Design a protein with these regions (language model features):
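Conserved catalytic or regulatory cores that recognize and/or transform ribose-phosphate-containing ligands
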Residues: 1-114
């Protein structure tokens, strides 16, 4: 690995990446993609949603149940969650993910102030 020309901050970060799971309404697909890139470039390992059902991805009711449960497992894997709450919007699914994360001792950060 070539780390000769990187800052001390980056050198200290290597191998110590925090894991963050993105939560929020899948209607905000562009925000998910932007935040994922921003957090990755800040040194986070980012776990995101697997499908954007509210942005046009076709998802059956059965798949929705599976994806909701799978997202809770993604929260389990993370150190924290990052809530994409564009214009202050937090839907029922996102609210349940926030409660789940808090009940499991995860730090919760919001894209916009609540």
């Amino acid at each position: 690995m070539l780390i000769k020309n990187v800052s001390a901050e980056v050198k200290n970060m290597i191998g110590k990446y925090e894991v963050v799971t993105l939560c929020g309404s899948t209607r905000f697909k562009d925000d998910f993609n932007r935040v994922q890139k921003e957090l990755t470039l800040k040194g986070y390992i980012v776990i995101s949603v697997g499908s954007f059902g509210h942005s046009g991805d076709a998802v059956t009711d059965e798949q929705k149940v599976m994806l909701d449960d799978m997202h809770k497992r993604k929260i389990d894997m993370a150190d924290s969650i990052f809530v994409i709450n564009k214009n202050g919007y937090i839907g029922k699914s996102t609210a349940s993910e926030i409660a789940y994360a808090e009940n499991h001792g995860k730090t919760v950060t919001y894209m916009e102030s609540c």
